[in-house]
Amino acid sequence: SPQEALTHWRRKWGLYRTFLDGPTLKDFEQTPDVPVEPKVVFQTRVWSEKEVGPDNHLAVNSLRVEVMRRLRAELGDQFVGGLVPTAYAREHYPDVLSSAPARRQKFIRWSKRYLVGVYVRGLNYSYGFRFAEHLAASQCVVAHPEGFRNPAPVQPQEGVHYLPFATPEECVKQCKRVLDDTELAQAMRNANYQYYQQQVAPAAHLWNCLERGREYYASL
């Protein structure tokens, strides 16, 4: 019917707009010599049980929320971010909601202004998008080790590309360490920019995939 056709194309247009209005590669990228504010950024989502598939939504959410609460309490104005204010987050975790931009392009431009990014695992122990975003922006990273459970072709190195934490308290400690040590911070920014350029940037990633494929078939 005409009404069904109209509904169909409205949905299609909404999908197209998502890509047309979304961030470009230049929005993500930033060299390590660009000045940034000495603050810690951590903004992410929480999920309901039906949204996470085989993962445990309570385990995913609790780590994120407890880290945010501790960072807010200990760092004060040096912490920015919080939970994206979805209906689920507003109902279950109203004390850690973020007022910062949530739409992709505005969020990316906003979040890369800060020195340190906190990273936790994605759903089902995947690499979260946030880690690549921090690398592209030449930010320092404080990361939970579960975020690296699945190995990358070239694994990020602890102490070089990120500082690890196991508890919310340790996350605060590691963030303060970076904020207080300008030499450490600059070295990590440089290392993460280099890692991004060599392993994560789309052209480099595609080239590495082709090279590994060539090496594999040459070995047959």
Indicate where each model-derived feature is located.
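Catalytic binding pocket for nucleotide-activated donors in carbohydrate/polymer assembly enzymes
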Residues: 93-98, 107-220
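Nucleotide-sugar donor-binding catalytic core of glycosyltransferases
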Residues: 1-128, 142-154, 158
